[in-house]
Design a protein with these regions (language model features):
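Short loop/turn and low-complexity linker motifs enriched in small/turn-promoting residues
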Residues: 3-114
Length: 114
């Protein structure tokens, strides 16, 4: 049975300049926002206004979204997919050249059959 994830936190990383240093343009040439997803599982797919993804470590994936994006859907390997609507966490829409941290956690620890 697949376990569910929940958002531990989602916020702007004011001192993190990654989105301005590693700028990714959207289809109109405008700079994207960067959402750093923290999760103790691999992520199979991310849906939304995603322009680029980058696996930084086994527990961190960078996702570049078009400025103004309000949500993202994440499909991890061992958990049910989760949709995150940013306005529920005080962010009306992500802004270009800004970095956000999305920290996800499970209700229960992941137990794999051996």
């Amino acid at each position: 049975m697949a376990q569910e994830l929940k958002v531990k936190s989602f916020s702007v990383a004011i001192n993190d300049l990654s989105a301005s240093v590693e700028t990714v343009p959207d289809k109109n040439g405008d700079p994207c926002a960067l959402v750093k997803i923290l999760l103790v599982d691999s992520i199979v797919k991310v849906e939304g206004f995603v322009l680029k993804t980058k696996s930084v470590s086994p527990t961190e994936k960078w996702v570049y979204l078009s400025s103004g994006a309000k949500e993202v859907r994440i499909m991890p390997t061992h958990y049910k997919p989760i949709s995150i609507y940013f306005p529920n966490f005080g962010v009306k829409g992500v802004e270009g050249k800004r970095t956000y941290i999305l920290d996800l956690e499970a209700d229960h620890p992941l137990v794999l059959n051996q």
